[in-house]
A protein has these predicted regions:
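Short, solvent-exposed loop/beta-turn-alpha elements that line the ligand-binding surface or hinge
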Residues: 59, 131, 211-222, 290-299
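Bacterial N-terminal signal peptides that target proteins for export
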Residues: 1-12
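Pocket-lining segment of extracytoplasmic ligand-binding domains
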Residues: 175-178, 182-270
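C-terminal segment of classical bacterial N-terminal signal peptides
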Residues: 16-26
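Conserved C-terminal helix/tail region of periplasmic/extracytoplasmic solute-binding proteins
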Residues: 304-337
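Short, glycine-/small- and polar/acidic-enriched structural segments
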Residues: 29-170, 179-192, 203, 207-208, ...
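Secondary-structure end/capping motifs
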Residues: 236-316
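A generic alpha-helix surface/boundary motif
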Residues: 51, 91, 149, 229-230, ...
Length: 337
């Protein structure tokens, strides 16, 4: 049993005992929500923590607990097991899961570009593009993660067969930087603020940049909606009012990001997220503001692009009939107050 599952079991048992003793709480059970975030210090997942810092969850009468999890694939496993109610992770997981007969739905879209960059070690100038991935170890947050999906796509698109390079799970932040420094990986996909830290240390330079919509279209052939809040269809069906409250909070957060400067947004965030470099954090946020959706809506051409990308290399998705309309909904965003 994992530490998380053990704590969840203890918490559940405690809840049962309190209920039996006749205790009550101010918030209803439906308004207590646990969400796993695939690394909430990352700028790509900033809206989840920003909503908390701005008081938008409480404003909706919600008691939201955010749990940090480095890799999205582990987060979705916890949700499917019923241990948490939602995941803040990449939209592409909904397509991947449907191909395996599991139905989850993106209810609000945070990013319209991945915010990811393939970084190449300064020790390996021979890697000039994805066509040079062959024979190298490439860093990803986790095997089965969105960074691994994108890495595999870029390789296959550029004529490099799966199996001729190795994806290495190195997480993000300090662990990613250490792997690059120790030459355990020669290139790897990561986000801010890790990108800025690598460049400042002279360890790596950007190879393929997907922090803007235009750059993403050039790399992937279309808009690639990335981080979002997704939940199981079963949970959504049974808790529509709670889901609407959550989406209300996130739509308000997206509008805050759109209407405020990087300095103003950074001032709301925990100082430790800036790993001792607040100036670099603000600079990275300013450069990446375009990746955030202004209103939480799914870009119209996004799902088709993601399906095309996954169909290129994924044995789970390739050849399967995927109903994209069941992988996301705009119902709650359009009704947001």
């Amino acid at each position: 049993m994992t530490k998380f599952k053990f704590l969840t079991s203890v918490a559940f048992a405690a809840t049962l005992m309190l209920g039996a003793a006749g205790f009550s709480t101010a918030a209803s059970a439906d308004d207590k929500i646990t969400i796993i975030v695939g690394g909430y210090e990352k700028l790509i997942y900033l809206p989840a923590k920003l909503a908390e810092r701005l008081g938008y969850y409480k404003e909706q009468g919600l008691d939201v607990e955010l749990i940090n999890e480095a890799a999205g694939v582990d987060a979705e496993d916890e949700m499917l097991a019923g241990n948490v109610q939602g995941v803040v992770g990449f939209y592409d997981h909904n397509i991947d899961l449907q191909s395996k007969g599991k139905f989850t739905v993106d209810v609000v879209q945070f990013l319209q570009a991945p915010g990811e960059v393939e970084m190449v070690s300064t020790k390996h100038p021979e890697i000039k593009g994805a066509a040079d991935f062959k024979g190298h170890d490439l860093g990803v947050t986790g095997l089965g993660s969105s960074t691994n999906f994108l890495t595999q796509y870029l390789a296959v698109k550029n004529g490099v067969e799966l199996g001729t390079f190795t994806s290495v799970a190195v997480g993000a932040g300090d662990t990613f930087i250490a792997a690059m420094e120790q030459d355990k990986i020669q290139a790897g996909m990561t986000t801010e603020p890790t990108i800025t830290r690598l460049v400042k240390k002279g360890l790596a330079t950007p190879l393929i940049d997907m922090r803007t919509v235009a750059a993403t279209r050039a790399a992937l052939g279309g808009t690639y909606p990335a981080s979002s809040l997704y939940m199981t269809q079963e949970y959504i069906n049974g808790h529509k009012e709670t889901v609407q409250k959550l989406v209300n909070a996130y739509v308000k957060t997206m509008k805050y990001i759109h209407d405020h400067s990087a300095e103003e947004i950074a001032a709301q965030m925990p100082k430790d997220y800036m790993v001792g470099d607040p100036e670099g954090y603000v600079k990275a946020l300013a450069a990446g503001k375009e990746m955030y959706t202004p209103d939480g809506l799914m870009p119209e051409d996004g799902p088709k692009t993601v399906l095309a990308v996954l169909s290129t290399f994924s044995k789970s998705v390739k050849g399967k009939t995927i109903d994209l309309s069941k992988t996301y909904t705009t119902e709650f965003v359009k009704a947001a107050k």
